Design a protein with these regions (language model features):
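Cleavable N-terminal signal peptides
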Residues: 21-22, 32
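A detector of low-complexity, intrinsically disordered, Ser/Thr/Gly/Pro/Ala-rich segments
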Residues: 10-11, 26, 37, 42
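Second-shell loop/turn segments in exported
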Residues: 57-60
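Compositionally biased, low-complexity segments enriched in small residues
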Residues: 8-9, 24, 50
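Bacterial N-terminal signal peptides that target proteins for export
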Residues: 4-19
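SH3-family beta-barrel domains
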Residues: 34-54, 65-69, 76-91, 95-120, ...
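N-terminal signal peptide c-region/cleavage motif recognized by signal peptidases
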Residues: 27-31
Length: 169
């Protein structure tokens, strides 16, 4: 009985199909893994305009419009490309996940100006005074003080009690 001779590509085709399936499984697993992130966690507004909605879809009405890139939000729940978040004033609603980023930031709260100091001490040199509502990138916290950067150039230490977004969510 003669042996069947297969064309040279016959061995490659099953391998290519297996490789394609493997690649497809990785591509679909990444978004699923992102959906499984443990909540709560901090996120920052990436977009120049962000709509907060009453439900997890563009079909739901808008409850708030944010025009504050860098504003910290606490992510409370995940749902298919949407995040239930809480803002510094306690307002809650759903936002599109693609408009958020994982970079940590903090916003100045409380009454009056918050001193920004050169070091993490109340007797350290005063660098600037920050109004409530000023947003800065959070670089780290220690012993009741947080190092923040405002507008990419103003660096210093602010008492953690004057910030929202610095603590464990």
């Amino acid at each position: 009985m003669p042996l069947a001779v297969l064309p040279h590509y016959a061995c490659i085709m099953p391998f290519a199909a297996l490789l394609a399936l493997l690649l497809l499984s990785f591509l679909t697993a990444a978004p699923a893994a992102a959906q499984q992130r443990e909540t709560p966690y901090w996120a920052t507004i990436r977009a120049s305009e962000l709509n907060m909605r009453v439900g997890p879809s563009a079909e739901f009405p808008i409850s708030w419009v944010y025009r504050r890139p860098g504003l910290p939000l606490k992510v409370l729940r995940l749902r298919e490309g949407w995040r239930l978040v809480e803002d510094p004033d306690g307002a809650r609603g759903w936002v599109a996940a693609r408009l958020l980023e994982d970079e940590r930031s903090a916003v100045v709260t409380g009454d009056g100006l918050a001193p920004m100091r050169a070091e993490s001490s109340a007797v350290s040199d005063l660098r600037w005074r920050l109004e409530p509502g000023v947003v800065g990138r959070l670089e780290g916290c220690e012993a009741g003080w947080c190092r923040i950067v405002v507008k990419g150039e103003y660096r210093g230490w602010v008492e953690a009690s004057r910030l929202w977004g610095d603590k464990e969510p």
